[in-house]
Amino acid sequence: MQMVGTEILENIIMNNPKQLTFPWSKPNRSELNDFFFDEKNLKLKDVLLSDEDFFLYGRNKVGKTYLMQSLCNLYAKKDKTSLYIPLKDILNLGPSLLESLDSLDLICVDDINLINGKDNWELAFFNLINNCLTSKCRLIFCASINPSQLLFELKDLESRIKKLDSFEILPV
């Protein structure tokens, strides 16, 4: 039986309360110490290790996904809850997946630009951001484009994301 919406997340939470991943993802052993931070990217390491929300961007294959998964693994080692959300893999499941996630310690969202023009997804992320602001859940968004290039239909969502500090991962 295929589960949809919050049923997937409920099942995941029950199976592993520390690090949450979607059931089709392979085991991930990414670690920040294995990522090469050169002089151009040293500030990024400090931001990753902070408690701040931020927006991460850069060309394809520079390590955005790796860094977010590494951060989720770090949170798991500290007995904190985290969730990596690969939007390209879950858009067809619907935005109800985002309900009640603000109780987590960290949410990393990959390819946030993919929700552009998808009204239900935009509203769900707007609500998630607002809920995380009050619950202290840390949010990290990533895309291959600079956040200044995001053009969401829901302008309140656009302004919330554009207010975040942004960091570009520069190729080595």
Name what the model sees in each region.
Residues 164-172:
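Conserved AAA+ ATPase "SRH/arginine-finger" region at the nucleotide-binding site
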